[in-house]
Amino acid sequence: MKKMFLTGVLALAVAIAMPALAAAPKAPADGLKMDKTKQPVVFNHSTHKAVKCGDCHHPVNGKEDYQKCATAGCHDNMDKKDKSAKGYYHAMHDKGTKFKSCVGCHLETAGADAAKKKELTGCKGSKCHS
């Protein structure tokens, strides 16, 4: 009877833990070079660990599959003037999209702090474009 009870408790614990364990894949190593624009960015997932994966990696065909930004069919148009959802530059720099761009999130993070704003959103000498 005790074995059956313990087996049931263990099975329940595993069933409850599985969604949490499968929720997000392991983030890639730091030093991810995003070089699709004139001024490359070295992106570190560890710096952004407080941000949920889905805040940047939006659903594609109803699924969160955490692809790279410039994956074919996503933000794969490298024309800086392309302001559509396909535009890579636009996806990183737009301030008013449903899914926050890098710049949109950094502006929100900086708030009214002018020095922080320059540090997080400046084109030259920022933490992004060094």
Swiss-Prot record:
Binding of heme c 1, residues: 45, 53, 56-57
Any one of the GO BP annotations: anaerobic respiration
Protein name stated in the entry: Cytochrome c3
Cited InterPro entries: Cyt_c_III (IPR002322), Cyt_c_III_dom (IPR020942), Multihaem_cyt_sf (IPR036280)
GO cellular component: periplasmic space
Chain positions recorded as heme c 3 binding sites: 48, 102, 105-106
Description of post-translational modifications: Binds 4 heme c groups per subunit.
Organism expressing this protein natively: Nitratidesulfovibrio vulgaris (strain DSM 19637 / Miyazaki F)
Protein role: Participates in sulfate respiration coupled with phosphorylation by transferring electrons from the enzyme dehydrogenase to ferredoxin.
